[in-house]
A protein has these predicted regions:
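Non-heme di-metal
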Residues: 1-9, 18-209
């Protein structure tokens, strides 16, 4: 069985106590799969998918008030792009080598007519990706709160995929991605507290006696 080896970006493990970021690299193997109609449940370009996450974090980093916040957003955005590549590999491997009868029987026809077995950024209903999925307010606290919500939505999406998937190889990848979303949620919570403290410190006023 052919294997695909992906380097899952630069993963930022943020230590709240020492306020340092240790950048590590993680490798993950993706196996070639047989055709599976699970494609309709995968979100290569959905509202809570990896593409939106990477663009959101790359765009938000510029207005972060601390270098640590900028670095964390950049690192997680980079990792999300690696996750997007992994999801794209799954979509392609689930659909390549299909024949006309499989396309007709599986409900894959609408997608196939437009994209064949190409990997197109759309949600599970075939709706194309749009920048309207991402939020960039320019307010660091609002954006980081949005990021925490986005990670929970991504985790919930992977939970839903695991409920309907009967492919153990696919499930291994989805579980890995789900775990990373949980870690991202925790890191964003930590950096939100740090940024809030930095902003509050600048707004303190002292009155002389």
């Amino acid at each position: 069985m052919t294997k695909y080896l992906f380097l899952v970006g630069r993963i930022a493990e943020f230590g709240l106590s020492c306020l340092n970021c240790a950048i590590t690299a993680v490798a993950f193997r993706i196996f070639v799969f047989v055709f599976n109609n699970l494609l309709k449940h995968l979100q290569y370009g959905g509202p809570d998918g990896e593409l939106g996450a990477s663009l959101r974090y790359f765009s938000q980093r510029y207005t972060m008030p601390t270098n640590m916040a900028k670095g964390l957003l950049n690192d997680i955005a980079t990792e999300e792009l690696a996750h997007l590549e992994m999801v794209g590999a799954i979509v392609y491997q689930l659909t390549r080598g299909t024949d006309a009868q499989i396309v007709k029987d599986s409900g894959f026809g609408d997608y196939f007519m437009n994209h064949s077995t190409g990997v197109y950024p759309a949600d599970s209903n075939g709706v194309p990706f749009t920048a309207a999925y991402i939020a960039v307010s320019g307010d660091p606290l609002a954006d980081l709160a949005e990021d925490m919500s986005a990670e929970q939505k991504a985790r919930a999406t992977y939970d839903n995929i695991l409920r309907v998937s009967d492919d153990p190889d696919v499930n291994d990848v989805i579980r890995f991605l789900r775990e990373r979303e949980i870690v991202h949620f925790q890191r964003f919570g930590e950096i939100l507290n740090s940024v809030n403290e930095a902003i509050t410190a600048k707004n303190k006023f002292f009155m002389s006696k």
